[in-house]
Swiss-Prot record:
Keywords, in A-Z order: Membrane, Transmembrane, Transmembrane helix
UniProt topology in membrane: Single-pass membrane protein
Pfam families: Shisa_N (PF13908)
Organism: Homo sapiens (Human)
Name of this protein: Protein shisa-like-2B
GO cellular component annotations of the record: membrane
Amino acid sequence: MSEASRLCSGYYSLNQSFVEPFQCPRRGEGAALQYCCGFADLKYCCSEPGSYFPYKHSYMWSLSIGALIGLGIAALVLLAFVISVCVLCYLFLYTKPQRLDTGLKLQHLEASSTQEGKSNGKTKALNSNAASNATNETYYEADDIIQEKTMDATQIHIAY
């Protein structure tokens, strides 16, 4: 073991008083404390080279209660944020409005007129009678009748 690791050089402590250089182990200390350890403002003899804390590590928990409380609050806020984001994503993805039935089915007039023509002979009679009058009036009357019958059929389907 080198003599340099046993010699602690002089230093200024926190209260700006000068501490004289000393040799490890000091008088009254155990023989195992052979190394000079510590910082520039606090030096002491220790059993392992490179040790920087003269106290047990548990002192750090008692000194940082405020930091632990702050970290705990920050963790709770982060947890609340993550839960809120998850709930909002669930609501957005799984509670989309369902397709509402307006009660009206959209159909092409040609398709509905052929279906009505097959099922109802009165429409054909109306079309042939109206053709003798005026061509424009025939189309308007036939379209009105077809639309009324389509709406009636749709309302019957909705009622069931």
